[in-house]
Regions:
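N-terminal "assembly arms/tails" that initiate or stabilize quaternary assembly
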Residues: 1-74, 414-415
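Core alpha/beta structural scaffold of self-assembling particle/tube/pore-forming proteins
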Residues: 97-100, 104, 108-421
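Extracytoplasmic
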Residues: 44, 82, 393-395
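Short, conserved beta-strand segments within well-ordered enzyme catalytic domains
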Residues: 48-50, 88, 164
């Protein structure tokens, strides 16, 4: 027979959940994909999810022979993070309700802070929409610049968009809004509570966990030969066929010695095109270094899929994923964007960053003498609390655990804003 859980411990767990729910700022705005235990075990903790398809338009009455094959790409979603808070409670400490409340808040703060930090770092390092401001962001125009960038790319305006501002930026924007002669409660809320609310088409959130984007070493780096990416659903290795992650590509350059993951660059002549209509936005596409793979190769986001290669290096179906005007030219010099370190404010189209929620098979029948409680939070993450103690020591060991993964499902629909030069 499994041990029963003391009332004090049950109340403590409820308090942890309540505090955790109140602190998961970014996770609450992300998409949640629950991966069940059996799927996780049978797929080595990774499943492939379909990327949004883009249609191809043919004009005219007779479209004989113009049919386009369906090319559906996929993105890997993985469980890879186990966060824990472990501590002991004595029989004396269990008597004090206020002590238990404080420890519950500390536990929830630790777990939620780690989740928020991981999400902020993911977008800060992989989001490809980089809005580099001439001065520190301070008002409506800065958020409006993000809105304009997303609109030019035809990122759906009917979907919710969110921006997560570092505290200093949030307060500067609150001050700007408080000085506006606007209708409604926003100026008063900004003045009294430093609250912005819905601002320039975005839900705004004040955060204290946004990272700093370091300054790039800015080495002189050139592209080795003309390069672009051909969207392909699958790849074959050693006779095995499996999905291909098309979010990025390998770029070969003259050298990578001082380049770092997270660096931002543009390529002369390589301009953005909008996702649906394929209009030239007249803005250089910003790229992120995701990883350094060798002395001359690096993985970058997003992939370079040139509009002018349709019918040549790309089929029409592959061309539906075009995101730039032309390929990276041979010998083109990379222009580094983050020439100065700057505090990041991140933004996204809701649903483009995902929390993969996992489960761990823990129960009292498997671990004799231990008690387990589990609950799924509103952010989709399951919190498990394990307790184990002995009367001889008068001490209860407590372990709080969550298991999840984070994935930037579409780096072309999220990014960062700040002063990086």
């Amino acid at each position: 027979m499994a041990n029963s859980t003391p009332k004090e411990i049950t109340i403590f767990f409820d308090q942890v959940l309540e505090e955790f729910e109140a602190m998961t700022t970014m996770a609450d705005e992300a998409n949640v994909f629950p991966m069940d235990k059996q799927t996780a075990q049978n797929s080595s903790e990774t499943v492939w999810r379909p990327e949004a398809q883009i249609g191809d338009i043919q004009n005219g009455l007779d479209v004989t022979g113009l049919q386009t094959e369906i090319l559906e790409l996929a993105v890997p979603s993985s469980l890879d993070t186990i966060d824990n808070d472990t501590f002991t409670l004595t029989s004396l400490e269990l008597r004090d309700k206020r002590f238990m409340q404080r420890r519950a808040k500390a536990a929830a703060t630790k777990l939620s802070a780690q989740l928020n930090q991981n999400m902020a770092n993911l977008v800060a390092q992989t989001g490809t929409l980089v809005v580099n401001q001439a001065a520190l962001p301070s008002g409506y125009s800065d958020i409006a610049d993000i809105e304009a960038r997303m609109d030019l790319l035809e990122i759906p305006i009917e979907d919710q968009r969110s921006v997560f501002l570092d505290s200093a930026t949030y307060n500067r924007m609150s001050a700007d809004l408080a000085n506006k002669d606007l209708l409604g409660p926003s100026p008063e809320a900004a003045l009294r509570r430093s609250r912005i609310g819905n601002f320039a088409g975005f839900e705004t959130f004040r955060t204290n966990f946004q990272p700093v984007l370091p300054a790039a070493a800015a080495p002189a780096t050139t592209v080795t030969g003309k390069q672009f990416h051909v969207p392909t659903a699958n790849q074959t290795s050693a006779g095995q066929t499996f999905p291909l992650d098309n979010r990025g590509m390998t770029l070969t350059v003259s050298g990578t010695a001082t380049i770092a993951a997270g660096d931002v660059f543009t390529i002369p002549g390589v301009y953005e095109v909008s996702h649906i209509s394929k209009n030239d936005t007249l803005q250089l596409r910003t790229f992120r270094v995701v990883s350094i793979d060798s002395g001359t190769t690096m993985t970058i986001y997003p992939r370079i899929v040139p509009l002018d290669e349709i019918g040549a290096g790309l089929t029409r179906a592959q061309g539906t994923y075009a995101n730039v005007t032309t390929a990276a030219p041979a010998a083109a010099s990379l222009t580094w964007v983050n020439t100065a370190a700057g505090k990041v404010s991140s933004f996204w189209r809701d649903g483009t960053v995902e929390v993969v929620a996992g489960q761990i098979a823990w129960d009292a029948d498997m671990f004799k003498g231990a008690n387990f409680m589990r609950e799924t939070t509103s952010s989709g993450i399951e919190i498990v609390m394990a307790t184990e103690g002995t009367a001889m020591s008068g001490v209860v060991d407590v372990r709080l655990t969550d298991y999840y993964g984070l994935v930037n499902t579409d780096p072309q629909q999220n990014g960062i804003m700040g002063k990086f030069a």
